[in-house]
UniProtKB/Swiss-Prot annotation:
Catalyzes the attachment of tryptophan to tRNA(Trp). It is an enzyme of class 6 (ligase). Homodimer. CDD domains: TrpRS_core. The lineage of its organism: Bacteria, Bacillati, Actinomycetota, Actinomycetes, Mycobacteriales. GO terms for molecular function: ATP binding; tryptophan-tRNA ligase activity. InterPro entries: aa-tRNA-synth_Ic, Rossmann-like_a/b/a_fold, Trp-tRNA-ligase, Trp-tRNA-ligase_bac-type, Trp-tRNA_synthetase. This is Tryptophan--tRNA ligase. ATP binds at Q21, P22, T23, G30, N31, G159, E160, D161, I198, K207, M208, S209, K210, S211. Its EC number is 6.1.1.2. A motif ('KMSKS' region) lies at residues 207-211. One of its GO terms (cellular component) is cytosol. It catalyses: tRNA(Trp) + L-tryptophan + ATP = L-tryptophyl-tRNA(Trp) + AMP + diphosphate + H(+).
């Protein structure tokens, strides 16, 4: 039996891992429908590891108190959305020192040119300017690789913007295994079934993002329902008044249909058929109602979790304990393979 077999055998489910940054006061609708909604389903069939990557968050300036508060809030939101600590391992990245330690090893295995070709770094550094871009942003992909490889997941759900980073992760895993001996699982990336790409309400050809140019294009899950309803009803559509699903020619209308479909479970085709002879006002009202029906109980659950900080921290401590046991063991194998002298007790 190899070292990898200790974590995964034919009798145990495959492991899946993903994370979401604590860089805003609320996760947005795109975060949920494009990722977290699928995490909730995956925890029923996989050995699921989900984490809050606060180390990644500090690649840009953060207010310390805000970061701490957002980390707690992020955990509460994930639990309120349906991440079950009995079926998933939920933890905070910085609670596991092995993430930063393995990141350094992987950084030393990464060529400068290889790292320089990462599209996300090039785009962000061009936008921010060299003087305002941290070296942490440059090494972000190697930290992401460490996040993944520490837990030997077979599957990693990723969006299109992270595919290049996952390919680097796979390359580094193979490079290490070939050079020093097999330690790492080489993970497969996948887009989970049912994942919905949600677009900006004011610019429906751009992905919904907290960094969007117009805040009215964003739906935050914890926003007052009246605010969210107003944003849905002011969403950009078009002038022909026909409700049809056509991403190329009717991106705004198509986006609203996808949102409503994902929230209600009705197929887009069935929704379109039901709007025959109706205008955009009906589509927007129904989508706003579906959103409110989803976020109202969510906010209540979130408030309940936030009212018991000690219980939240207990859940994260249990997750960190389990994650730490695995990560520490894998890091020890890495250190042994590369020739580090192991510490000994006196």
């Amino acid at each position: 039996m190899t070292s990898q077999d200790n974590d995964h055998t034919a009798q145990t489910p495959a492991r899946v891992l993903s994370g979401i940054q604590p860089t805003a006061d609320s996760y947005h609708l795109g975060n949920y429908l494009g990722a977290v909604k699928q995490w909730i389903d995956l925890q029923n069939s996989y050995d699921a590891f989900y984490f809050i990557p606060d180390l990644h968050a500090i690649t840009v300036d953060q207010n310390p108190e805000e970061l701490r508060a957002r980390t707690v809030s992020g955990a509460a939101q994930l639990l309120a959305l349906g991440i079950d600590p009995e079926r998933s391992t939920l933890f905070v990245q910085s609670h596991i020192p092995a993430h930063a330690e393995l990141s350094w090893v992987l950084t030393c295995l990464t060529g400068f040119g290889e790292a320089s070709r990462m599209t996300q770094f090039k785009d962000k550094s061009t936008k921010q300017g060299a003087e305002r871009t941290s070296a942490g942003l440059f090494t972000y992909p190697m930290l992401m690789a460490a996040d993944i490889l520490l837990y030997r997941p077979q599957l990693v759900p990723v969006g299109e913007d992270q595919r290049q980073h996952l390919e680097l992760t796979r390359t580094l895993a193979e490079r290490f295994n070939n050079r020093f001996g097999t330690v790492f699982e080489v993970p497969e990336g996948f887009i989970p079934e049912g994942a919905s790409k949600i677009y900006d309400l004011q610019n429906p050809t751009a992905k919904m993002s907290k960094s969007g140019e117009n805040p009215k294009g964003l739906i935050n899950l914890l926003d007052d329902p009246k605010v969210s309803s107003k944003r849905i009803k002011s969403a950009v559509t078009d002038n022909d008044g026909v409700i049809a699903f056509d991403v190329a020619n009717k991106p705004g209308v198509s986006n609203l249909l996808v949102i409503q479909s994902a929230l209600t479970g009705e197929s887009v085709d069935k929704l379109v058929a039901g709007y025959e002879g109706k205008g955009y006002g009906a589509l927007k009202t129904d989508t706003a109602d579906a959103l409110e029906a989803f976020t109202t109980p969510l906010r209540a659950k979130y408030d309940e979790y936030m009212s018991d900080r000690a219980e939240l921290e207990r859940v994260l401590a249990i997750g960190a304990e389990r994650a730490g046991e695995i990560a520490t063991k894998v890091l020890a194998e890495v250190y042994d393979k590369i020739g580090f002298l192991a510490p000994r007790s006196r």
